[in-house]
């Protein structure tokens, strides 16, 4: 029989982990001083007055490099635990990791062919 009372701890942690950040934002919003002045409204650039406009438009090339970096950085995060427990896991996990790496290599080749890795 399916018993819902076994999930009481889960619901308690869910409620507590939701309430704590909300309370932190509310309390900091209530206790923080609200003063608007020219220093508060100016943009900050290494402790000196900004040179030029603070809003610069970046080329899409930067975003493409960042996106490719994030994809392969996440790949490393997923492959590290697998590499640390490689001797304990079986052949099926090795095949799954191999398929995962092959899918990422296909994505890298696709990005390379589309010119996402060229800086010109």
From Swiss-Prot:
Q: Sorted alphabetically, which keywords does the UniProt record give?
A: Chloroplast, Membrane, NAD, NADP, Plastid, Plastoquinone, Quinone, Thylakoid, Translocase, Transmembrane, Transmembrane helix, Transport
Q: Name one Pfam family in it.
A: Oxidored_q4
Chain ranges passing through the membrane:
9-29, 64-84, 88-108
Subcellular location(s) of the protein: Plastid, Chloroplast thylakoid membrane
Note the topology in the membrane: Multi-pass membrane protein
Q: Which family does it belong to?
A: Belongs to the complex I subunit 3 family.
Q: By what name is this protein known?
A: NAD(P)H-quinone oxidoreductase subunit 3, chloroplastic
Subunit structure and binding partners: NDH is composed of at least 16 different subunits, 5 of which are encoded in the nucleus.
């Amino acid at each position: 029989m399916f018993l819902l009372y076994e999930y009481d701890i889960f619901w308690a942690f869910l409620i507590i982990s939701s309430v704590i950040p909300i309370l932190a934002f509310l309390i900091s919003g209530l206790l923080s001083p609200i003063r608007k002045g020219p220093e508060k409204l100016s943009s900050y650039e290494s402790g000196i007055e900004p040179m030029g406009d603070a809003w610069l438009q970046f080329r899409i090339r930067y975003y493409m490099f960042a996106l490719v970096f994030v994809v392969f950085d996440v790949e490393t995060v997923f492959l590290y635990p697998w590499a640390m427990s490689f001797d304990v896991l079986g052949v099926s996990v090795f095949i799954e990791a191999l398929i995962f790496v092959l899918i990422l290599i296909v994505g890298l080749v696709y990005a390379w062919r589309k010119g996402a890795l060229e800086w010109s």
